[in-house]
A protein has these predicted regions:
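Catalytic-core segments of class I nucleotidyltransferases/pyrophosphorylases
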Residues: 141, 174-252
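Well-ordered alpha-helical segments embedded in enzymatic catalytic cores
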Residues: 37-41, 107-112, 224
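Short internal beta-strands
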Residues: 52-58, 154-155
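Short, hinge-like loop/turn segments at secondary-structure boundaries
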Residues: 71-73, 168-175
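Conserved beta-loop-beta/alpha segment of the NTase-like Rossmann-fold superfamily
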Residues: 82-172, 207
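N-terminal nucleotide-binding beta1-loop-alpha1 segment
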Residues: 1-32, 43, 48-50
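Acidic donor-binding segment of Leloir-type glycosyltransferases
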Residues: 62-86
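A structural signal for short hydrophobic beta-strand segments in well-ordered beta-sheet cores
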Residues: 28, 170-172, 237
Length: 252
């Protein structure tokens, strides 16, 4: 049986949200009164049987920690596995900058290398805290394994319109295979937008993170997925059919 662990990136798009994230991370922005945005990826992981989760933080994460606590509400406060906060200072990383904080998702994962090395799961689910949806990662893993791909990207149609820039746009051929990938692109209709969720084997992730950061490449979408697609990685796309809310700007 293939096993999964999860990593949530908590600070995605903080700078785009104005005063909403002045004192908190994007993941801890309130939703529906008592809830926070991080509840969505945490619940998705818990409901998918994932009990080993790391939350990557960058700054202003006290309210996030206060809300999540030990993770008991999501059944991840277990002695084996459980939940771990991966902040840049606790990870002991010095990137030569003014404050030692990571420069991109791959840099953050390089900081968290010991977390990955000490884990036992076969696959890692990497998720942004900015896309709100109900998703079963077991179905994504099934698609990933059956495809024989190195990386699976969860994608959503109806987002790309030629005007709105997305982190990653994916074009599929008539067989549903990935035909093109572009990053930071206002892709036209017909492209799928990344839903901020990826599956990759733990061993391959560690290998590719080390390779990328050693070459000053720090961005997951651009430097691992897109660069890998154009070089040597097989990329699979999993079209998500459910409803998803993309929280990327205070103007939306």
């Amino acid at each position: 049986m293939k096993t999964m662990m999860g990593i949530i990136f908590a600070n995605i798009y903080d700078k785009n949200m104005g005063e909403l994230t002045y004192l908190r991370t994007m993941a801890s922005v309130p939703y529906g009164g008592r809830y926070r945005q991080v509840d969505f990826p945490l619940s998705n992981m818990s409901n998918s049987g994932i009990r080993h989760i790391g939350i990557v933080t960058k700054e202003k994460y006290q309210s996030l920690m206060n809300h999540i606590g030990s993770g008991q509400e999501w059944d991840v406060d277990l002695e084996e596995g459980g939940l771990q906060y991966l902040n840049p200072f606790a990870m002991g990383h010095d990137n030569g900058g003014s404050d030692g904080r990571y420069r991109g998702k791959l840099d953050a994962l390089k900081c968290a290398m010991s977390f990955l090395e000490l884990s036992k799961e076969d696959y890692v689910v990497l998720v942004d805290g900015s896309v709100l949806c109900a998703m079963d990662y077991r179905e994504v893993l099934k698609s990933h394994v059956e495809s024989g791909a190195d990386v699976t990207v969860v994608v959503k149609d109806g987002i790309c319109d030629g005007q709105r820039e997305v982190d990653m746009a994916v074009r599929l051929d008539e067989m549903g295979k990935v035909a093109d990938i572009a990053c930071n692109y206002a892709a036209p209709q017909g492209f799928y937008a990344s839903a901020g969720a990826f599956i990759i084997s733990r061993e391959l992730l560690m290998e590719k993170v080390q390779e990328a950061v050693a070459r000053d490449r720090y961005h997951l979408e651009r430097d691992l997925v897109m660069h890998g697609y154009h070089k040597d990685l097989k990329i699979n796309a999993y079209p998500f059919a459910g409803v998803a809310l993309y929280n990327e700007s205070e103007l939306e």
